[in-house]
Design a protein with these regions (language model features):
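Extracellular modular ligand-binding repeats in secreted and cell-surface proteins
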Residues: 1-49, 97-98, 105-109, 114
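A structural signal for leucine-rich repeat
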Residues: 160-165, 184-189
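Short, surface-exposed terminal/edge motifs of secreted or surface/virion proteins that either
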Residues: 40, 182-185
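Consensus positions within tandem repeat domains that build extended binding/scaffold surfaces
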Residues: 110-113, 133-136, 159-162
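LRR flanking "cap" motifs
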Residues: 60-115
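Extended beta-solenoid/beta-helix repeat architectures
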Residues: 72, 80, 126-127, 131-132, ...
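N-terminal low-complexity, Pro/Thr/Ser-rich intrinsically disordered segments
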Residues: 47-67
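Structural signature of tandem-repeat unit edges
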Residues: 16, 86-108, 118-131, 141-156, ...
Length: 200
């Protein structure tokens, strides 16, 4: 703990943005007396200094948009856990994202990723998603549109109740060539018959 001349009593600081090979990081200090914060830059990492990710690690992508879980290090695949900004009305699960400057494919949406989110109104699901966990959209009362770009979903890769609990006012948009197959698939995974599924 550091006490400076103007009376601030700074804590030991928290890394709020990790440094990478391409960008500096940020460390934020908070005054334990008044709550004021100050930031300090963390130098870019040199070659070889990057933390080696392993399967199961939960990290934030370089854009600070999402928390993801490393699914396969060799194939460079991650699982989307949740958005960083819990107040975001529009969320995009991209086809790929960068972690420590390295590109990873986003291939799965974790269980409960948006469960109980009463703010989000639009969710776009990227083309590389091949697996969806349980209760991903349950309780998303303000959700108006889910746009799926993926054509890789199957009975085996979509969890039971993956689409349960979606508001009746939600519309799901899917690639036109998958409309018939996805309608059957989603209903078998808990989707209400009152939710519209449209092709685009």
């Amino acid at each position: 703990v550091v006490l400076d001349a103007v009376g601030h009593n700074w804590d030991n600081g928290k890394v709020t943005k990790e440094a990478t090979k391409t960008a500096e990081g940020i460390k934020t200090y908070t005054c334990t007396v008044c709550g004021k914060t100050k930031t300090q830059s963390i130098p870019k990492k040199k070659a070889g200094e990057e933390k080696q990710l392993k399967k199961g690690d939960v990290v934030t992508d370089d854009k600070r948009a999402a928390r993801v879980k490393v699914a396969d290090v060799k194939k460079k695949e991650v699982e989307y856990k949740e958005p960083v900004n819990k107040k975001a009305k529009t969320v995009t699960i991209p086809a790929t994202m960068k972690i420590n400057g390295t590109t990873y494919k986003v291939t799965k949406i974790s269980d409960n990723a948006f469960k109980g989110n009463k703010i989000v109104t639009r969710i776009t699901v990227g083309k590389n998603i091949k697996s969806i966990g349980k209760n991903v959209f349950s309780g998303t009362t303000k959700l108006k549109t889910i746009t799926l770009k993926t054509t890789k979903l199957t009975q085996k890769t979509v969890s039971r109740n993956a689409f349960k609990g979606i508001s009746k006012s939600t519309t799901i948009k899917v690639p036109k060539k998958k409309l018939s197959a996805y309608k059957k698939l989603f209903k078998s995974k808990g989707l209400s018959s009152k939710v519209k599924v449209k092709g685009y």
